[in-house]
Amino acid sequence: MRGKTHYLAKASLTYGVTVLTTLAAPAPAVGGLRRRRLAGLALLAVVLVAACLASIAVGAKAIPLDGVFHALFTPTGTEDDIVVRSLRMPRTLLGVLAGGALGLAGALIQGHTRNPLADPGLLGVNNGAAFFVVIGIYAFGVTNLYGYVWFAFAGALAASVAVFVLGSVGRGGPTPVTLALAGAAVSALLAALTSAVVLIDVQTLDAYRFWAVGSLAGREVEIAGQVQWFLFAGALIGLASAPALNALSLGDDVARSLGHSVRRTRTMGIVAITLLAGSATAACGPIAFVGLVVPHIVRSFTGPDYRWLLPASALAGAALLLLADVIGRVVVRPGELQVGIVLALVGGPFFIWLVRRRKMVAI
C-alpha cells in the first residue's frame, strides 16, 4: 500500500511539474505546442475517416471505393448498396461510438485516479455487465442482443455505484487509492459470481461466451440507437470536466485552492465514465486495451492538458477500434476474428513495447 501510494504521489508531482512548465513556457513555445496539438487532432480525424471507409469497403466481399460512395450517396438497391447500408454502415457507426466512448472513458479514469495503468474496467464496468448478462440469460431467458444491452448497462451502472459507495467510505471521500481498491474487490466478487452461474448451466455458458468475446459483428443500427443518448450524455459531462480535471491532476489540495469541489468533480467523472464505458460494453461486449493505451498514445502530442487530451482520446479510440475490426475481417477471410481478440493479440505486445521504449508520457 505504501509503495502504491508513493507511486501515485510521484506521478501526481511529475504531472504538476509538467503542467507548470507548460504554463510558464514562452509565447513561441506555447504557439508551437498549439500547432502540434492541432496537427495531431487533424491527423487523427483523417485516420478516422480512412478507418470508416475501410470498415465499409472491407469484408467477406470487398467493395471498391466508388461502390462505397455510390451506396452512401446515390443508392439504387444493388447488392453492394444493401451490404453497405444494411450491414456495414451500422457496424461502422457502432464502432465509432463505442471506440470513442472507450478512449474518452480511459482518459477520464486515468485522470481521476492519477493512475497511468487504469482503464474503465477499474470501476467494475466489465464484470458488472457480464454478471447481469449472465443473470438475464439464466433467470429471464434473454437470448438476443437487444436484451443483452439493457442487462449489461444495468450491471455496469450497479457495479460503478457499488465501487463509488465503497470508495467514498470515510472522512476524505473517494480518493484514487480507495476507488482502485474498491474496484478490485467488486470486480473480483462479480467475476466469481459470473463463473459460478456459467459453470452450473451449460446453456447459459454457450450463450454468454459469444457476447463476452467483444464484437461489432451482427449489431444492427437499433443497437446504436439504444445507447447513443447515454454515450452523448457521458461525452458532454466528460468534456465539460476538463478544466476541473486539470486542477485535480495537480492534487486535491491544489484543486480546492483553485475553487474546485473535489468530491463533485470526481463524482461527475465517475458518472461520465459509467455512461461511456457501460454503454460501449452493453452494445459490443467487454473490449479491453482501448481505454488503457489510447490516452498514452495521444499524450505524445497533446501533453497533459485534458482540454486537448479528452477529444483526442475519443478520436483515437474510434479509429483504433475500427482498424482492429477491419484487421479481424482480413486475417481469416472469408470468416472473421472478433475485435476483442484482435485487440488482445495486438494491443498487449504493443503496450509492453510502448512502456519499454519509454514512449509513455508521464501522467
Q: What are these regions, as identified by a protein language model?
A:
Residues 4-363:
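Alpha-helical transmembrane segments in inner-membrane proteins
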